């Protein structure tokens, strides 16, 4: 299956070459394919903040490479460069506060720096660590894809009609995808009849990115308004809702793109299974529950302006980027370490004590 999954991969969003980070600008897809070249930590932080790159795993990978770029510049300046590099990493950390992969990746860079011995090349060590983070995410995606497809087969052997939210494919990760990776694997095994993709307002990641990725691979996809999701579950035979995650807490609560929580509520009401797919780097065992998660809010103009025109002078906007889905609404969390069905604190702790499967 691994070879079939790799052969099906057609899209990537991150490229590290010639001492620079190249990012596919996801703000202009699918209308244009524009790559930007970054050579500074500040530039990468701005790319994350402005959503040139998005998706929790992709953000973490980009931040790791951003730290390498920062180290190169600071070492070239001479002197005691570590405090200046720490400032660069803090700038990267501040770019998106909810995606725990960002902090996980930067902490791995810090840990690697602490292990550099006298006479070692610190820049080479940090670059190797960033590349390892990138490659391990790709391998995790392949493992999760197979585990998720196996879970679908275990519960329901017939053709599946799946609903997904936001974008969780190759564009959001180091390769292949999380939730979309599971859908790809299930399609390769002949289990997917159709995928419904929420448009995912206000950035339209579902319509611009997910529908584009699926259509490019010949997977039957139908785009729907976010507000049609419950109606779809009632009338179109949805069998699974499959989503990604930006942070998973110690008790199994999940922070993901705004709109995920209402999908889980509707799925519970309609008897539709709800699967979350994310690498273990998304799990924050230091955070007890979703009540502790800081929810990022973006500029209200994303909602208040249509075609460049403001909808109302005296209208305010509430524009959270994420919401929190309680663990008791989730049927399964799929990671590269394994699957947790009906997640709770004890089951999450057991999962995180395992070694990686890949």
Curated annotation (Swiss-Prot):
EC category: isomerase
Keyword set includes Isomerase: yes
Transition state stabilizer (site feature) positions: 166
Biological processes annotated in GO: L-methionine salvage from methylthioadenosine
Record keyword Oxidoreductase present: no
Signal peptide (from-to): none
Protein name: Methylthioribose-1-phosphate isomerase
Organism: Pseudomonas syringae pv. tomato (strain ATCC BAA-871 / DC3000)
Gene that encodes the chain: mtnA
């Amino acid at each position: 299956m691994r070879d079939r999954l790799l052969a099906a991969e057609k899209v990537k969003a991150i490229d590290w070459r010639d001492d620079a980070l190249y990012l596919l600008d996801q703000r202009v897809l699918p209308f244009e394919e524009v790559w930007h070249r970054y050579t500074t930590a500040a530039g990468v932080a701005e790319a994350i903040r402005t959503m040139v790159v998005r998706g929790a795993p992709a953000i973490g990978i980009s931040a790791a490479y951003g730290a390498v770029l920062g180290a190169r510049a600071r070492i070239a300046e001479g002197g005691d460069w570590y405090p200046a590099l720490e400032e660069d990493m803090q700038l990267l950390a501040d770019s998106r506060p909810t995606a725990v992969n960002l902090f996980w990746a930067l902490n791995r860079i810090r840990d690697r720096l602490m292990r550099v011995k006298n006479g070692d090349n610190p820049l080479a060590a940090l670059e190797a660590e960033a590349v390892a983070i990138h490659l391990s995410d790709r391998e995790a995606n392949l493992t999760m894809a197979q585990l998720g497809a196996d879970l679908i087969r275990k519960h329901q052997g017939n053709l599946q009609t799946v609903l997904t939210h936001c974008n969780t494919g190759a564009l959001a990760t180091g390769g292949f995808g999380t939730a979309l990776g599971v859908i790809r694997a299930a399609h390769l095994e002949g289990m997917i009849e159709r995928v419904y993709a929420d448009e995912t307002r206000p950035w339209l990641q579902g319509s611009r990115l997910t529908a584009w990725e699926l259509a490019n691979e010949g997977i039957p996809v139908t785009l729907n308004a976010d507000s049609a999701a419950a109606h779809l579950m009632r009338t179109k035979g949805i069998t699974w809702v499959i989503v990604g995650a930006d942070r998973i807490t110690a008790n199994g609560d999940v922070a993901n793109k705004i709109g995920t929580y209402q999908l889980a509520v509707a799925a519970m009401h309609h008897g539709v299974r709800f699967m979350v797919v994310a690498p273990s780097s998304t799990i924050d065992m230091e955070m007890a529950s979703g009540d502790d998660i800081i929810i990022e809010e973006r500029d209200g103009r994303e909602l208040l302006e249509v075609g460049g025109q403001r909808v109302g002078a005296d209208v305010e906007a509430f524009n959270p980027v994420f919401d929190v889905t309680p663990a008791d609404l989730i049927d399964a969390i799929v990671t590269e370490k394994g699957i947790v069905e009906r997640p709770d604190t004890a089951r999450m702790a057991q999962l995180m004590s395992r070694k990686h499967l890949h």
